[in-house]
Regions:
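Conserved "right-hand" nucleotidyltransferase catalytic core of DNA-directed polymerases
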Residues: 1-165, 171-177
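C-terminal substrate/ligand-recognition segments
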Residues: 180
Length: 180
């Protein structure tokens, strides 16, 4: 009462049954479509990685099999290759790379985006399917974020890419509809 949050508490309490239902009922995932999306993303990842390796040819050490020894997973690895190639971006944040005129910035940015999709939304995502009903039962946190917004974890359904490739995987099963 002191903070005048009665209305907020009322809204939060009213939303609780909906969150509980979402967690308990789960979310249908079209696994065949998900596998297709993952395969397409993997192909894009390989394409972006090849473009990155071409861009920084000669700056990455090779392993015993002649393959590039870097997985380009860390900023330090990317910065080291950039320095060897005579390119010095201010930093590797997307916002910074978008302002760079050097075409290598775009190559780095596209690779990192494809790598992020591969890491967060690959076949590993399917481990969240419940064995009993084949649905995803995420954990919703109504007021966990500092911003006051709700969050979702295990998995983070709010972080699913906003592309038809991924969003279409959350289709209603036959005879049902999703209302958004």
């Amino acid at each position: 009462q002191k903070e005048k949050l009665e209305e907020t508490a009322r809204i939060e309490c009213a939303a609780l049954p909906a969150y509980a239902r979402l967690e308990l009922k789960g979310m249908h995932l079209d696994t065949a479509r998900w596998r297709t999306a993952v395969a397409a993303n993997d192909a894009e990842f390989r394409e972006k990685r090849a473009a990155l390796l071409e861009c920084f040819k000669g700056t990455v050490e090779q392993d015993l099999f002649g393959e590039p020894g870097s997985d380009w997973g860390s900023d330090e690895q990317i910065k080291a290759s950039c320095r060897k190639a005579g390119y010095a971006p201010r930093d590797l944040r997307k916002e910074t790379l978008q302002t760079e005129r050097d075409p290598r910035a775009k190559v780095i940015m596209e690779f990192r985006e494809a790598r992020g999709l591969k890491t967060a939304h690959g076949l590993e995502f399917l481990r969240f399917l419940h064995v009993a009903d084949g649905r995803i039962h995420p954990d919703f946190n109504q007021i966990a974020a500092n911003s006051g917004r709700s969050s979702c974890a295990e998995p983070n359904l709010q972080g699913i890419p906003r592309t038809p490739r991924y969003r279409s995987c959350f289709a209603a099963p036959a005879g049902r509809k999703i209302v958004t």
